[in-house]
């Protein structure tokens, strides 16, 4: 999702500068994948290294932090607006429950609003879009297909 910064996506967990034993500075950035096995992790890591190198930091280490796992709740408001402007439906709040989960025989989450016309009448086309973190929907009002970033 090139319209988002790693910070706006919520995967950038932290950046710190440490001094090595030889007296040099190294930037250590921590990122969390949106999904286990996220195919964008290598690209995100490479982008971070290149951006920090371009900013004058020749030594960069990128660490993967898996705990706590990423949540779509971590997407910033600026990131959600960027998703909508790019024609994607931003996720709603992630479900956070503990204990027994009731059996649901209908849809497991409410259908998202269309990012183009705003209609609440949309239909799930496919559980998976171009990546596992997105689903495909069609608006029954304007008939446009769109991707929805899943609530995790």
Question: Where are these predicted regions, by residue range?
Answer:
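Domain-level signature for proteins that mediate thiol-based redox and metal-cofactor handling
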Residues: 1-152
